[in-house]
């Protein structure tokens, strides 16, 4: 089961809470609430399910590939997390207001640079009508409705304001938009694998009009996953033939691969699920990169084969250092980066772009209660 970023958001929001406490006082050992019983999944409904849900964890994730009017290329990822107390679904009247964490990364391919920033906030954000209507995390905003998604993220030297229009229907991962694992809980999960995007990028003293393609993921549920050596590799690939590929490889608490699965989405939006253990997907890591910031060794370069689809591609980062270290503790650090794709499909050349997410490679420091 793919439970991307659950540890990241919990670590980030835990960090926010610890920052507000007196550091001279001991931090009590947390009393984790048990996961809720796994319910029977219900059919997703839009626009209602674009908006927030009363579950332990939820996020809206975007990664994109942009060009300015001069042809210069950029990659970005923008994600907002919502965390609720599972015992009362974030009832602020009982002192359990929802917590929010947001992260933004920008890769400037011409300058071979990667910038990043984070924001945190807490408190109820009432929604009027279906969808997600201007969720705020400090000075960043996000809105999501079936016909239009938008966000605004600003840092000291970068501002990206985007409008994104879906060009395909929602892709329900695992065919029904729901996955469950034996020990880690359950999650609803759908993607909008190709959105037409346009907006404004302010980079230093330059203001640039940008456009391109975006991948969006939305997940919510009752789940949790441990950090190093547990973790995952996730791939969101957009091919130039109009199809998309999602791949997830998860590792258990012993660092062993326990699942490899994904989906192939046709140009018309038809989704073909690739189930764990089916033998329909082969993922091989080639090479590694060691972070000068954390000492973590990340995979760097992959070969993917889908024999039934006669698809074979190589995936390579466009910039090696796309590690996200703007949050602490170390369990919240991960690699999220823009990649280039080259290969063949049915004997014909195919290229593409994508984003890869790598978690569980940084050995965390002991937490305050240890």
Show where each model-derived region lies.
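C-terminal motif of bacterial Sec signal peptides marking the signal peptidase cleavage site
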Residues: 16-19
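Bacterial N-terminal signal peptides that target proteins for export
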Residues: 1-9
